[in-house]
């Protein structure tokens, strides 16, 4: 888990972890030098339960480096990523682990990535979309090849479980990796790994003011909103293309071609 000024939600997330039906795990936390009560809350849980490994970073590392540092620091058979503001349903770890172990029996020694859908909620955990995959046009079967995976994200970090063979492939990583979950997914696809999507959503994916900040102000000015939207879309696509380029994706023209093609295929599937 990577944390930063998460006092409002982190207690609820931690509680959901300790209510899991599968309890054989250790929680590693990197805190990005929070200046609220986040660390105090974490230490309270650590005192009660004892299986939390907390490290406080120098500020400003960012999500990519925080999560990758956590992955590198931990030593286990399997690894999951956790956001500070979500809530895990009680069977999340058990269900994901069961799928991982089943796939390992079929393909021993292979890099494996198991991931699930999510239930999108508002800040009070009222479900606004029962399927993140549906609302974000995610088609796991279509996104199983580099051509499409290079233009559209597939696995969300907080739903993922990876095994040790896949962890070994994840390092080293460049700054252009952009997002830890996208980097690991692309590594799995391009290095002979196996993707195991589970459609059953086992997480409440909270959307709140901190991750939609500024949207209402932009809507007050249509032109400003449109310009900001276009700028964001262009900037994000440049980042995604740079990420895909680490895997010899090809030209910018190819990227645009498969970007458009994916949306046409998704609309008619």
Where are these regions (language model features)?
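Membrane-interface aromatic/basic loop that binds lipid-linked glycans or pyrophosphate carriers
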Residues: 242-269
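Catalytic core of nucleotide-sugar-dependent glycosyltransferases
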Residues: 135, 140, 204-247
């Amino acid at each position: 888990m990577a944390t930063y000024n998460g006092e409002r939600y982190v207690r609820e997330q931690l509680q959901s972890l300790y209510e899991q039906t599968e309890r054989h795990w250790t929680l590693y936390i990197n805190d990005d030098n929070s200046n609220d009560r986040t660390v105090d809350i974490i230490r309270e849980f650590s005192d009660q339960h004892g299986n939390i490994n907390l490290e406080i970073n120098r500020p400003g590392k960012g999500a990519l480096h925080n999560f990758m540092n956590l992955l590198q620091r931990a030593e286990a058979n399997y690894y999951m990523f956790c956001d500070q503001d979500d809530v895990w349903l009680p069977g999340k770890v058990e269900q994901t682990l069961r799928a991982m172990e089943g796939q390992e029996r079929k393909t021993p020694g292979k890099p494996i990535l198991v991931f699930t859908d999510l239930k999108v909620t508002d800040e009070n955990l009222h479900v606004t979309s029962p399927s993140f995959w549906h609302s974000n046009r995610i088609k796991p079967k279509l996104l199983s090849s580099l051509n499409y995976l290079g233009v559209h994200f597939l696995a969300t970090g907080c739903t993922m479980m990876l095994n040790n063979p896949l962890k070994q492939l994840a390092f080293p990583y460049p700054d252009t990796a952009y997002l830890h979950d996208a980097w690991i997914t692309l590594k799995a696809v391009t290095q002979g790994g196996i993707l195991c999507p589970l459609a059953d959503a086992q997480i409440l994916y909270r959307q709140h003011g901190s991750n939609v900040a500024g949207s209402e102000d932009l809507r007050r000015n249509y032109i400003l909103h449109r310009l900001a939207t276009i700028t964001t879309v262009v900037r994000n696509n440049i980042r995604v293309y740079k990420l895909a380029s680490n895997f010899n994706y090809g030209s910018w023209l190819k990227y645009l071609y498969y970007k458009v093609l994916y949306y046409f295929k998704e609309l008619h599937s």
